[in-house]
Amino acid sequence: MRFAAAHALCLILGGLTVAAGGDSNSPWHGHGPGAGDECTLVAKGHGIDDAPQLLHAWQKCSTISIPAHTTLNIATRLNMTGGRDKHIDLKGALRFNPDIPYWTANGFPFTFQTQITFWILGGENIVLDGGGLLDGAGQAWYDAFAANASLLRPIIMTLYQATNVLVQDIHMLNSPEWNNFVNEGKNVTFSNINIQTFSTSKNFFANTDGWDIYRSDTVTIKDSIINNGDDCVSFKPNSTNIVVSNLNCNGSHGISVGSLGQFPGVFDIVENVTSTNIQMSNAQNGARIKAWAGPNVGSGIVKNITFENFSELAVDNPVVIDQCYETNATECAAFPSNTYIQDILFKNIAGTGTSTKVASLACSPDGRCSNVQVDNFSLSSPAGAAVYACQNVNLTGNAASLFGACTVT
Ligand SMILES: *[C@@H]1O[C@H](CO)[C@@H](O)[C@H](O)[C@H]1NC(C)=O
Ligand SMILES: *[C@@H]1O[C@H](CO)[C@@H](O)[C@H](O)[C@H]1NC(C)=O
Ligand SMILES: *[C@@H]1O[C@H](CO)[C@@H](O)[C@H](O)[C@H]1NC(C)=O
Ligand SMILES: *[C@@H]1O[C@H](CO)[C@@H](O)[C@H](O)[C@H]1NC(C)=O
Ligand SMILES: *[C@@H]1O[C@H](CO)[C@@H](O)[C@H](O)[C@H]1NC(C)=O
Ligand SMILES: *[C@@H]1O[C@H](CO)[C@@H](O)[C@H](O)[C@H]1NC(C)=O
Ligand SMILES: *[C@@H]1O[C@H](CO)[C@@H](O)[C@H](O)[C@H]1NC(C)=O
Ligand SMILES: *[C@@H]1O[C@H](CO)[C@@H](O)[C@H](O)[C@H]1NC(C)=O
Ligand SMILES: *[C@@H]1O[C@H](CO)[C@@H](O)[C@H](O)[C@H]1NC(C)=O
Ligand SMILES: *[C@@H]1O[C@H](CO)[C@@H](O)[C@H](O)[C@H]1NC(C)=O
Ligand SMILES: *[C@@H]1O[C@H](CO)[C@@H](O)[C@H](O)[C@H]1NC(C)=O
């Protein structure tokens, strides 16, 4: 029955040649869905789960259209991996039904940071666009998390083993957890994404990162607006060749490399990352790099990272390197970080902090940071004269004089 219903909703594009569909041996009447077909989905309504028809269209159609004013009710998980030459034209919405017991038991799990997700999307040559909405229906999750701090909450969209992907002109609302996870991706672009997160109760929308990049190469994130409650963009282990530009981040924890080097025996690489033209407002951090130190941690390399053209407004820590992450001074001196940091540029960083300390570049002892350049800083604080702190690093650049001599531990 579901097949027949799904078929009835698959409209063949005018002008399509017969080669694209209409196999005479197919079980379909007339044109069955085949390569080149466009399928248009209509919500079943009455609380019926639309995930099966969306999955069916993903298997059978090259273009999947969700028209304006159509909200698909996604009540079961979406495994949309291994696709090829797919276009999801989302003008309407996908709303992820907040059935907490269902998702905590059935969300796709990832060992990395113990995450789960509603949706894995992967394969090759995939476009998701159309101006529509991914609605995480997060309020129920924010309220449940307030009562259960170990509650697993689903990421809206995980690009998993995805190559040559474009996500553009998409709104994301109230994710229960991270908004976008790029896991083992290559050549992925996000453009014109509008992320909004808010709570109508007293409970906060925790861990709602904009993007987390992991084991991925060649990722671009640009021209987007993010209003959330955790990292705006986070470069996790093995993020390489990344450009982030023209973002307006509000209320976040900033743009962050790391934390890296946490797990013994694991080597983390973050290399070739540029973040530029960033408006960062009401945030915990602006531009940040953090790496673990201590006795039982991992190792890695952070190399060629540029933070350029940051305009910051009311940011608690506008510029940060913390290479003694989660350790105190004694322990960091005994066990300096094995995640080396080199070739770092902070350039054209302007705006306001919230406390007097507007920059803190704290490296582990024993020369674990090298070639750190600071240029053209223009930061002030409403709390008094701006303080620039540095430790165990030789800074270069025209803003180095603001820092003066760095502490050696
Ligand atoms: C998703 O579906 C593919 C087959 O289509 C399967 O190989 C894969 O294991 C599934 N992934 C998960 C996480 O269930
Ligand atoms: C809290 O969440 C965890 C993880 O999702 C779950 O295993 C546990 O049962 C929940 N606890 C309660 C009291 O609901
Ligand atoms: C990268 O992906 C885009 C689609 O976003 C595609 O147009 C482009 O050809 C891909 N680049 C390479 C080198 O494959
Ligand atoms: C920006 O973030 C602040 C602090 O989190 C919040 O109070 C404010 O409403 C946000 N502004 C917008 C435009 O969303
Ligand atoms: C990162 O890449 C390196 C080199 O390929 C590899 O040895 C390491 O295990 C990777 N780390 C992670 C966290 O995947
Ligand atoms: C970083 O970029 C340089 C210059 O393009 C390139 O040679 C190097 O291979 C890149 N590193 C990684 C890890 O991709
Ligand atoms: C540094 O990374 C950027 C990408 O973020 C890349 O364009 C540039 O070539 C890299 N430079 C070096 C010296 O590797
Ligand atoms: C930073 O801003 C300056 C001045 O607006 C501009 O010339 C430069 O191209 C920008 N840098 C990047 C990497 O966008
Ligand atoms: C530093 O941390 C270590 C390990 O947690 C702890 O044993 C030690 O007491 C701490 N020292 C200070 C000065 O807080
Ligand atoms: C320094 O930053 C200011 C904005 O804070 C900008 O107008 C100016 O062009 C920058 N100077 C250089 C040399 O990049
Ligand atoms: C800073 O430079 C001096 C002189 O070259 C060198 O002795 C010292 O080890 C360097 N410090 C760090 C933290 O790299």
Predicted regions and their residues:
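Extracellular/periplasmic carbohydrate-active domains that bind, remodel
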Residues: 2-409
